[in-house]
Amino acid sequence: MSAVSRRNVLRGGLVATTAGVVAPGTVAEAVAAADGASCPAPPGPAMVGHGDRRYRSLASRGYNRRVVGEPEHVWVVGTTAHVVRAAQQAVDSGGRITVRSGGHGFENFVADPAVEVVVDMSAMTGVSYDPARRAFAVEAGALLGDVYRRLYLGWGVTIPAGWCADVGVGGHILGGGYGPLSRLMGLSVDHLYAVEVVVVDRRGRARAVVATREPSDPHRDLWWAHTGGGPGTFGIVTRYWFRTPADGDDPSGLLPAPPAGVLSFQVSWDWEKLDRTSFARLVRNHGAWAEQHSAPDSPYLALYSELALTRRPSGTVFMIGQVAADSGAERMLDEHIAALNRGVPVQPVRPVRNQAWLAAALAGSPGDPGPVYRLKVKSGYLRRRFTDRQIEALHHHLTRTDYDHPGGGVSLYTHGGKVNTVAPDATATPHREASIKMF
Ligand SMILES: Cc1cc2nc3c(=O)[nH]c(=O)nc-3n(C[C@H](O)[C@H](O)[C@H](O)COP(=O)(O)OP(=O)(O)OC[C@H]3O[C@@H](n4cnc5c(N)ncnc54)[C@H](O)[C@@H]3O)c2cc1C
């Protein structure tokens, strides 16, 4: 999907796309009657423009400051009905509209000079169990940390989503949702039961539609499109429902349970001691290990690692990760490091930490704005390890001296396991043979 077509999100693009997926007149509108009545009033709707003191907080809360936008106004919304209203207003006025949830997108799909209206989902953060759908309902503005905390404390379950607790569920799920537990449990979208999404039909009417994975659901295609088809492409998601394909009425059996504890680690290799040969050996060993252990029957599925091949001026090549196992975690990590370091004459430094699972999942303190980042990121999936020629090119660019910026690099994430048990066409995330995810 090109950047241009993604950016068409909710103007012409949405109208055309949804008209193809959801036949007007046959859709079940998600009635927003449940919004509010006997509950405390939700925030919004508020149309925040330049003169409003909230404007700056709302308009500039994106993670990647390489891209900036200055929308005419930002909608604060608290219910699905508010989102429908915001979308309708943008359609009627012809304003280019987009949506922001956690603000952790890498590209300029939200922060862009061409965007006129932003719907900000950050006040819609509910996480609850919906007995009618036998699934966990998560509002799109929730951050992953909110989701982990509430699902785990409430029912002892989780979804295998990303490592950064600040990422928004709104955009994350639409890209597949990959994290430290995915080798054990699959992608987040493998547990997605339904979405509620605000779309605009061919007559220019905004409305909310619920699409489920039920084979009999006439909107099943719309559900499928939300299992990796890309964020902001088909409409504004207001709510997700999660349930692993499973039977039973006990909520604690409807999603996977994480381990009680994890072993978190950070391993680093001093760049000064890594020459061309030992660097190549380390990368080759890592690729071989990932290939060997990407099958669903690997005994190392609990081990997740991110090897960061940084630029030499940064000082160290490092690997962070966790072993999500209640027993045998130290042994697994020792064996992993030994396999990577075979023939590498540099002893890595290896701090480790035993943590309760929830503490590890919440690392990164949601809400902390942290440093300002300006990034350009590309990603890809590898079935096989890098060839020697590719490793040579990597080494050249990471060590070249005609460019002295310490930033930049290539990160290699262990992949596969349970992710690779799902058919490529079962969801809109077709990469089901990879051994490494690369950023
Ligand atoms: C520090 C960091 C760590 C990350 N870690 C991981 C990881 O471990 N695993 C992983 O898989 N990914 C990871 N990502 C990538 C992340 O999942 C995506 O960038 C995701 O799109 C961010 O979602 P967001 O809601 O936070 O971002 P936003 O900037 O709010 O949105 C990103 C995109 O999604 C669209 N969008 C947002 N909300 C909605 C909605 N409600 N309905 C429709 N479209 C919407 C936006 O319009 C935009 O195009 C990480 C990103 C960062 C910056």
Where would I find each of the regions flagged by the language model?
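N-terminal secretory signal peptides and thylakoid transit peptides that target proteins
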Residues: 1-17
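C-terminal region of N-terminal signal peptides and the immediate post-cleavage residues
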Residues: 19-37
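Cofactor-binding catalytic cores of oxidoreductases
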Residues: 36-63, 102, 107-110, 252-439
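Glycine-rich N-terminal segment of FAD-binding domains in flavoprotein oxidoreductases
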Residues: 52, 63-124
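Glycine-/small-residue-rich beta-strand-loop submotif within the FAD-binding core of flavoenzymes
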Residues: 65, 110-139, 180, 184-185, ...
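Loop/turn elements at helix/coil->beta-strand transitions in domains of secreted/extracellular proteins
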Residues: 92-96, 114-115, 154-158, 233, ...
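Short, structural beta-strand-to-alpha-helix junction motif
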Residues: 134-138, 142-152, 168-169, 353-357
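FAD-binding subdomain of flavoenzyme oxidoreductases
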Residues: 161, 166-270
